Every structure is written in C-alpha cells, then in structure tokens.
Amino acid sequence: MHQLVAICVVTTVMLLNSTPTAQAQQLGAGGPWQTYDTSNGEWRSYAGDIGGKKYSPLDQIDASNFTDLEIAWEWTSVDNRVSMSTPGGGEWSAPLDTIVDTLIEENPNLHRPGHRPSGSRLQATPLMVGGVLYFNTPLSQGVAVDATTGETLWVFNPKSYEEGTTPMTGTFRQRGVAYWTDGEGDERIFWGTGNGYMVCVAADTGQPCADFGPDGSGMVDTMVGVPRLDRNDRDYLNAMLWGVHSPPIVVRDRVIHGSHVADRRITKEAVPGWVRAWDVRTGEHAWDFHTVPNSADEFGVDTWLNESWRYSGNANVWSMLAGDNELGHVYLPTGTTTNDFQGADRPGDNLFSETLIAVDVETGQRVWHFQAVHHGLWDYDFPTHPNLVDVTVDGRDIKAITQVSKQGFIYAFDRVTGDPIWPIEERPVDTETNMP
C-alpha cells in the first residue's frame, strides 16, 4: 500500500484579500477583458497575471516577521482516494492503489511498466480568487480549497488514469488551472488533463459547464483533428502520445493551451505540437497554430526540406503561455522538434521549433516570430512563459516582451512588432564533426 500525501501550507500572518470579481475587469479593445491583475492581492493566473509578471503587492510577510510564521493548516491530497466507473454507469470509490490494482486486473497492459498512476508529483501553482484556492492534482483532478481553513470545497475528477499512462517524461503531473469570468457572475475554471481533454467547471460548485463542449460533459477532446494522433495509439513504452499538463491561458474569450507530446521518439513519424484555442463559453474550436506545417502552402514550409513536415512532430509548447488582452496577442514559446538530438530526417531550419511566436488571438494567425535556434539539435526548448514588461530605452517607451532560454540568453523584443530592443547577434554553428 502506497499512501501518498501532498501537503499545502499557509501561514497565520498572511491576510487573504478579495474583491468582487467584476472589479477585476478592465476595458480592452472591443470589450471588457479580464486582466488577472494582482493589485487586490489575488492570484488569478499561473503567473499572477496573463503577462507573466509573477508580482504581488502583498507586504505582510517580510524579513522582520518571517521567523514568526506558523502552519495554519495542512491539506491532504484528494488523489489518495479516487473512483472508477463500473458497469451500468455506476461509480466505485476506494484508495488509489485499490482502484489502480483493479484497473490493471481488468487490463494488464493499461499502464506503462513502472509508471502506475501516482499522486506524488504535486507541481501545480494554486490560483487564489475570492478567498478560494484553485488547482489540479497529478491525476488531473480539479480542486477548490478554502484559503482560510484548508477545507476542500469541491473536487472534479475526469478519471484520466482509467485510460492509460500520460506521455513519457511527464507522467502523472499537472501544473495548474486557468480562471475566467464575464464579470456578471459566470466564473469558470479550466484545466487540461493528462489524457488530453480540456475541462471547464463552474468556479463555485465544481460542476461541469454543460454549455462547454459537444455533449454536456464540460470537456472537449484536444486530440481530435491533430495529424498523426489517435487516442488509442501508444508509444514504444506504452504511454499516450499527447496530453495537456501545463495550465491553459485565457486571452479575451479564448482558452488556449499547448501540449505534452512524447519526447525522444524512436520513429521518424511524430505528432505535431500544435497550439489550440477554444471558445471560452461554448468550447467550440476556434483555431490551431501549426508549429509544424500541415500543407505545402503554409508559411515556413520552405524550412522543412524534403517535405519533412509531412512526418515530423513536436515543436510543442510544453511550458506556459503569456498574453496581452489589449493587443489581442498570445505568445507561444515552443520546444524542439523530433527527434530532439538527431536531425537527419528533417533538414532545414524547422520553423516554428524553438521559436517565440506572437499570434492574433482572434484569428490564430502569426503576427511575428523569432527563432532562437535553427535546426535544433540540443533540446533548447524555451522552458517557461515569456514576461510582458513596459520599459523605457533611450527615452522611448516600449511595450516589451522578454524570454529566458536554456541558451543562457534573455531575449527582449517590442511585443507589438517583434523588433529586438537590443541587437541580437546570430552566429553559425560549426558542422564539422570529424566523424566518418
């Protein structure tokens, strides 16, 4: 029996401020858009706001009182006890290990060997809205917790563990959820699941949004329509090929997400890591941004020689996104294409891998892009979301965006035009290897 307990700790010194959700709305181009502003002490997005600032004005905890902090409450993960569907539409609840053992008895090949469902990798950053914490668990359960008492207010379980092991290098882990409100009482929580669904529930009850998605379940299948992807396919380690592990982002009225696509494939053919957008109210598919081209007339297809775009994959956003409601842009930091360290099957620069892309949130069209590595062979994925900042350079005010990288550089651009704020020197890589 493996009892896994995740603990969330808060402190008695911290005061949790909240204001009515309607007060968080600000007017943007074309209508009222939520801003995820942290000025009222709340934390409405993974990074505080959709611009990725990660700044809170709360000042109740500082160097003078840090040593006085005490544990106010502890929270035990709801992943310790889960449920499974039974014949006839029933539901059976039991400890996690009991449920998993039963699933394996029914289908011995359900999970990747050595990677049975586990709740031990709690990586989510909670949101805090109106005195309630919202987050998801390693098993893709959505949770609301009273920030004052630690009481679990609701749980929504999409039961992703019933389908198999989530994609390799990211098995059974989740990083957070997204919050949206129309400012008039409709408040929703969104998150992706390890088996590739986008979930929408009511923030106050945790009940699925019946108007989101095609069947009243409050979920849409993010695998549908992606090339070279079938929900029943597994990789050579018996893991799923596609999941959503990082939190989506809501920009204007679009809920947008990247994906976790299985790394280090041993086959030439792989799933492209497209970025997908859905209507925040209905779940209707809005657009896809093709990080790997899907036709011979798309922008960037000339960077995939020998028509290698027809079978290459990944170039996914496995990390987080950033957005600008006023401009109507969402910013995509992409990763490496397949295979990470071997590029013989994909000659060319391989756009849009390892690229920062500004996309029009209404249309899904590219506004500008910067590719940090051409024909990547070193796994130089952009490892996190960019940061939207306003700077003054030589007396000129600039709406800027900065992106940290595995290369050790911080790239800085005008986020409207994509022009570098400071010159970027590009150097060729020596291709002589002295190998026969």
Set out the residue ranges of the language-model regions:
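Bacterial N-terminal signal peptides
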Residues: 5-17
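Boundary at the C-terminal end of the N-terminal hydrophobic targeting segment
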Residues: 22-24
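Blade/loop signatures of beta-propeller domains
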Residues: 26-76, 80-105, 291-298
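Repeat-blade elements of multi-bladed beta-propeller folds
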Residues: 43-47, 118-141, 168-197, 238-267, ...
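Extracytoplasmic beta-rich repeat domains
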Residues: 75-125, 155-183, 211-247, 290-320, ...
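Beta-propeller blade signature
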Residues: 201, 206, 271-284, 349-364, ...
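Phosphate/diphosphate-binding loops
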Residues: 385-434
